[in-house]
Amino acid sequence: MVDDRQGQRGGRRPRPSGGWSGPGRARPAQPQQPDGRHTPEPGPPIPPGVDARQLAPEIRGELSTLDRATADAVARHLVAAGELLDEDPEAALSHARAARARSSRIAAIREAVGIAAYYCGDWAQALAELRAARRMGSKSNLLALIADCERGLGRPERAIELARGPEAARLEGDDADELRIVAAGARADLGQLEQALTVLSTPQLDPARTGSTAARLFYAYADTLLALGRNDEALQWFLHSAAADVEGVTDAEDRVSELG
């Protein structure tokens, strides 16, 4: 079955088999200061070389409501989370949670937890955190991630509904293409491969494009063609995906070798 979620073949990761840390998991009592205020856990150690000043200026601006020591700790955990996201998403999630423990009312922090949870395949936590970030005014486009979380939770119909909504209609460029990939995957989840192919090819694909989003879009199109038994066309689009994949986010070259 075609699957665009973070999977091994398309450059995104598979869903973990268990051990999710969703909102229903019991939490230990939190330490408090003598005056009753919550004292956050120290969190994981900050990797060497991480500096709060590495945080994007717009996110540093969101931390301006915090005292200096707290803002510095949060910033360093967020930088660490970003640096670890691809190589060790579980560690990235630990750092993002450490930032959230110090301030849970800042959109960028909740977004960081949501994205790290998404990379870990913890769809329930990712969905809750990404929705919270949106409520708090996140300026990032999170619709494709939210729709993909719905897929991960076994609700492809909900992902399709989001992809048809007014917010989706306003998307352009890579943001629109990311949502196309998710919507096509949701169609494939339902066994609707022809509809998935239509989603991916509307508007018409441009094989001359490059970049990670184009590479994944072409890859998803090729994978859908392959699932439909159209192997020659699939090979051609895996070739386009490999050519577009300047950052190495897919295994398109391996698929070409398999089909060639």
Regions found by a protein language model. Name each.
Residues M1-S64, T70:
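Basic Arg/Gly/Lys-rich low-complexity intrinsically disordered segments
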Residues T65-A101, A112, Y118:
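Alpha-helical segment of the N-proximal tetratricopeptide repeat
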Residues A80, A112-V113, I146, A183, ...:
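Structural register within alpha-helical repeat arrays
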Residues D86-E87, C120, L153, L190, ...:
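Structural motif corresponding to the intra-repeat A-B loop/turn of tetratricopeptide repeats
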Residues M136-K139, A168-A169, T198-L205, N231-T250, ...:
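TPR/TPR-like (Sel1-like) alpha-helical repeat modules
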